[in-house]
């Protein structure tokens, strides 16, 4: 009798992401199911991330992924066909071994991750389980508070804002569905407020669906957001709070050894003072990458100073890498991890990274990348981990809303059980 969980075929192809760049899509088949996954890609990338394999040359301006696709079809597929699709960790470890490098540069993290996620989906489908339940078990019931990136700066935008993301979090809502409604209403009010102040051309959207108006000072977006939240009928701070992603590796000047914000130079202490001022003046509950990816000392300082009051998130600092997360925990650098599956390259390692963070009392924010697809795996992953937080862009563009819509479905499925943590987003169980 045939084994319903045996992998019978693996197919990879090149598709387009939300920026029109190629990315890898993988399908994994068993006699009773199919799992399909598409791989995201980032614009502001940490130096220590697992390597995304690109072809180079003229085709797609060098961004083709035919090599990664071929690595799936010719190298990975023959090795995993015949294996049990529920052996997630064995399959992930086998691919890591096949690759043989620390940063997955041989086969490509985009090849390996595509297979890893498609395997999980095929297994969930074979068992007739939703993906969040397959990964997280029966205890997966915490809905994430969205961190919605509504104003863009940095490498995601064409304006002069140095901080990359100005986000809103509906911390006062009673459910995910209510929270996402608040975000949507605020987003549309924000569009009107920006158009009135900066003109109609200022409401074009960036990679993640946020607006990129011609702002320069870091306080400008925060003032505009306060106005939009109030005009939408909500209370800044109490109902809708702010989260920032400074992405400061992007504005750190190595030659000067200084951070350049709004044309002004700041050393570590001065930048910390700027954050302190912003946190005292505005309802900011989370700051991501406040210092550059090797400024461990800066992270330790801000965590000591502000970590009791707000969340300090490591993204480029940790790159979802358990070694770097452990170093941060030992030093007391940051108090939360930004979890991006494509930074590490397999589902098993991403889950390990999350649990390393949880065990140390760190928060975990499950995150998209700026180059996304209609794949909504991270919505299921956020619930599977009971992370309590998700970062997946503005409520605009189908690639972002695919995740929000999946979370609406999951909350409906978990009716009567689902918990929306609100202000307890960092430690949903406290």
From Swiss-Prot:
One Pfam match: Enolase_N
Keyword Transferase: no
Pathway: Carbohydrate degradation; glycolysis; pyruvate from D-glyceraldehyde 3-phosphate: step 4/5
Binding site for (2R)-2-phosphoglycerate: 164, 340, 369-370, 391
GO molecular function: magnesium ion binding; phosphopyruvate hydratase activity
Residues where Mg(2+) binds: 245, 288, 315
Protein keywords: Cytoplasm, Glycolysis, Lyase, Magnesium, Metal-binding, Secreted
Cofactor(s) needed: Mg(2+)
Gene Ontology cellular-component annotations: cell surface; extracellular region; phosphopyruvate hydratase complex
Gene Ontology biological process terms from the UniProt entry: glycolytic process
Note on how the cofactor is bound: Binds a second Mg(2+) ion via substrate during catalysis.
EC numbers on record: 4.2.1.11
HAMAP family per record: Enolase
Protein name: Enolase
Gene that this sequence comes from: eno
């Amino acid at each position: 009798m045939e084994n319903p969980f045996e992998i019978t075929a693996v197919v990879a192809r090149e598709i387009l992401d939300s920026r029109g760049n190629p990315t890898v899509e993988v399908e994994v088949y068993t006699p009773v199911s199919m799992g399909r996954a598409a791989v995201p890609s980032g614009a502001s990338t940490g130096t220590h991330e697992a390597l995304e394999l690109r072809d180079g040359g003229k085709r797609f301006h060098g961004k083709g992924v035919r090599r990664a696709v071929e690595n799936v079809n010719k190298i990975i597929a023959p090795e995993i066909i015949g294996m049990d699709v529920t052996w997630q960790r064995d399959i992930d470890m086998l691919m890591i071994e096949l690759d043989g490098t620390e940063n997955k540069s041989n086969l490509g993290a985009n090849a390996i991750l595509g297979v890893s996620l498609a395997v999980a989906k095929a297994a969930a489908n074979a068992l007739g389980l939703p993906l969040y339940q397959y990964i997280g078990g029966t205890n997966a019931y915490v809905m994430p508070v969205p961190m919605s990136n509504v104003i863009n700066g940095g490498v995601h935008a064409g304006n002069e804002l140095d901080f990359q993301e100005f986000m809103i979090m509906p911390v006062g809502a009673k459910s995910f569905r209510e929270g996402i409604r608040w975000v949507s209403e605020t987003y549309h009010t924000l569009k009107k407020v920006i158009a009135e102040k900066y003109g109609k051309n200022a409401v074009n959207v960036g990679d993640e669906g946020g607006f990129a108006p011609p702002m320069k000072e870091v306080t400008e977006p925060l003032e505009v957001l306060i106005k939009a939240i109030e005009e939408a009928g909500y209370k800044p701070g109490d109902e809708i709070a702010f989260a920032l992603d400074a992405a400061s590796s992007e504005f750190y000047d190595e030659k000067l050894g200084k951070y350049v914000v709004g044309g002004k130079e700041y050393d570590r202490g001065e930048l910390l003072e700027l954050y302190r001022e912003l946190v005292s003046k505005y309802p900011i509950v989370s700051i991501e990458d406040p210092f550059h990816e090797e400024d461990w000392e800066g992270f330790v300082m801000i965590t000591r100073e502000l970590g009791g009051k707000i969340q300090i998130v490591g993204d480029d600092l940790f790159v979802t890498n358990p070694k770097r997360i452990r170093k941060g925990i030992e030093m007391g650098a940051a108090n939360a991890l930004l979890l991006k599956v494509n930074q590490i390259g397999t589902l098993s390692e991403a889950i390990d990274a999350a649990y390393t963070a949880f065990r140390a009392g760190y928060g975990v924010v499950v995150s998209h990348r700026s180059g996304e697809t209609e794949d909504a795996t991270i919505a299921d992953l956020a619930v599977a981990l009971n992370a309590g937080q998700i970062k997946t862009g503005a409520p605009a563009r189908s690639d972002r809303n695919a995740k929000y819509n999946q979370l609406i479905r999951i909350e409906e499925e978990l009716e009567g059980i689902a918990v929306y943590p609100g202000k307890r987003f960092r430690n949903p169980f406290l």
